[in-house]
Amino acid sequence: KLMKRNDWNMKPGEFHLTVIGIVQDLEGRFLVTRRNLDKEWAAGWWELPGGGVNAGEDSKDAIIREIKEEVGIDVSNAKGGHIYTYKNESPEEKNNYFVDVYNFVLDFKASDIKVQQEEVLEFNIATFEEIQNYEKEIGFLHYNSLKPAIDKIMKKQ
């Protein structure tokens, strides 16, 4: 079933698929972005690159596209892949979704990042401690849902 973009009028049992990319540099730091202040939802919060999966697209192609659109880097040949999926059910908001979480590790630096101006206020290549501080001070989108995936990554380092 196709749905209109941002049409959160889902019936029980209906879900849409979104993707999030945990992009890390070779030192294990995380590429994070801050949402523009004019966003209707979670304005100014920090987050990881990601978004919706388009009709006919698989989740890996979607996360590669979203990362390229939002921060201007190509992760198609990066080390890594799918590491985690979680489900969110919000019957009161009629917004149910699955999130496929990917982890990519590649050699990049701040000068390689070209943010999508309409979406992104700023970016950082952050340590996990910085991400924890963002969550406490400003807000970090999907932090609690992403914590198991980040913990899994941190154990490997």
Write out the residue ranges for each language-model feature.
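Acidic, metal-coordinating catalytic segment for phosphate/diphosphate chemistry
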Residues: 1-20, 26
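Short hydrophobic alpha-helix segments
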Residues: 5-6, 34, 86
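A generic structural micro-feature
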Residues: 11-15, 45, 93-98
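A residue-level structural signature of the nucleotidyltransferase/glycosyltransferase Rossmann-like core
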Residues: 14, 29-30, 45, 112, ...
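A glycine-rich, hydrophobic loop/mini-helix early in the fold
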Residues: 18-47
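Nudix hydrolase/Nudix homology domain
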Residues: 39, 55, 82-157
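The catalytic Nudix box helix
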Residues: 48-81
